[in-house]
A protein has these predicted regions:
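GST-like domain detector, emphasizing the conserved glutathione-binding G-site
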Residues: 1-109
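GST-like fold's C-terminal all-alpha helical module
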Residues: 79-187
């Protein structure tokens, strides 16, 4: 959503569109019939189709650092959020369980258990699921400290104006800080 806001493009939000999501997860956009899934691919689509440069004003070095920071969020922090939402029973009941409302009750718990087992397997294969809760908390804390150090006292991560990395960071920070879910990062 932040990418669309930064680019100044009109949009409508629909958080229930998993059936149309080509990668089986959010986000995705429907740009006049062209479905684009994944936040990075959405960014590239906006840059290509609308000529918007999310990193305008950044030096080549800053562009590289911003891209690496985004990937650290997407390929590290993301999995800790998935772990917290899908593997913690209390968080699952508050959020992801609602994705299964359309499934009739007698089979709903079976489907939920199967999907959660699949997600645990994905987390194990990716690596996050192999860490103890204490190790996960330590890694998450270290990542949050690194992000805070990168931000410093600047209004945005790479200067006076928001860039693509800020849009990515905002989404993850908002998700992690949601009072609706328990996240060790807030503790």
């Amino acid at each position: 959503e932040m990418l669309l806001k930064l680019a100044g493009l009109p949009y409508q939000t629909n958080r229930g569109g998993f059936r149309r999501a080509p990668k089986g997860k959010l986000p995705y956009i429907d740009d006049n019939g062209e479905i684009v899934a994944d936040s990075t691919l959405i960014r590239l689509h906006i840059e290509r189709k609308y000529g918007f440069d999310f990193d305008a004003g950044l030096t080549p070095e800053q562009r590289g650092a911003a891209w690496m920071f985004e990937k650290a969020l997407e390929d590290h922090f993301y999995w800790h959020v998935v772990q917290a939402r899908w593997c913690d029973a209390e968080n699952f009941a508050k959020g992801p369980a609602s994705f299964f409302r359309a499934i009739p009750w007698p089979v709903r718990p079976i489907v939920q258990a199967a999907i959660r087992r699949k997600i645990r397997g994905t987390l194990h294969g990716q690596g996050t699921g192999r860490f103890t809760p204490q190790e996960q908390a330590q890694l998450l804390k270290r990542g949050a400290q690194a992000a805070a150090q990168l931000l410093g006292d600047k209004p945005y991560f790479f200067g006076a104006s928001p860039c693509g990395a800020d849009a990515t960071a905002f989404g993850f920070i908002a998700s992690a800080m949601s009072p609706h879910f328990h996240m060790t990062l807030r503790d």
